[in-house]
């Protein structure tokens, strides 16, 4: 297991912080990763999102590499979208809602075509039922883009 990938995969001591099904943890340094792209989610979620990637992910995006290599880790940070108090037409991040992580490791996750997922609220993984929706959404919608929705923002 490569070092960047090891950061996102649970160890035995961190099992309670690992996502059900996949065993993915929040990577320690994800807030320092490079921005891949911002996004908005309309109602009912009404969120502002930022997708960041580790060095493996960023290199793949910059070179246009598909399939993403093993060791790719993406994190999607989400906040409630609220009007700016200084400029009403603008939206700004409000309360943080979740961080979602996707890890590419073909050997560890053969049942989900090499993808492991984690969804975290307040630093803790959500329940198994919510994790069952991850690959079920990615597989039919973005199979032809290596199961990744996010495109690199210029």
Describe the role of every protein-language-model region.
Residues 16-49, 65-154:
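Sequence context surrounding c-type heme c attachment/ligation sites in exported
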């Amino acid at each position: 297991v490569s070092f960047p990938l090891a950061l996102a995969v649970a160890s035995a001591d961190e099992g309670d912080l690992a996502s059900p099904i996949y065993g993915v943890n929040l990577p320690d340094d994800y807030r320092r990763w490079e921005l891949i792209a911002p996004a908005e989610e309309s109602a009912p979620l009404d969120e502002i999102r930022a997708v960041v990637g580790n060095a493996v992910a960023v290199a793949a995006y910059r070179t246009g590499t598909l399939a993403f290599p093993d060791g790719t880790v993406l994190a999607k940070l989400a906040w409630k979208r609220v009007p700016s108090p200084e400029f009403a037409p603008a939206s700004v991040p409000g309360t943080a809602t979740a961080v979602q992580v996707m890890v590419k490791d073909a050997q560890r996750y053969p049942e989900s075509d090499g993808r492991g997922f984690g969804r975290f609220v307040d630093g803790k993984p959500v329940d198994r039922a919510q994790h069952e929706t991850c690959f079920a959404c990615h597989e039919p919608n973005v199979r032809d883009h290596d199961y990744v929705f996010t495109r690199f923002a210029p």
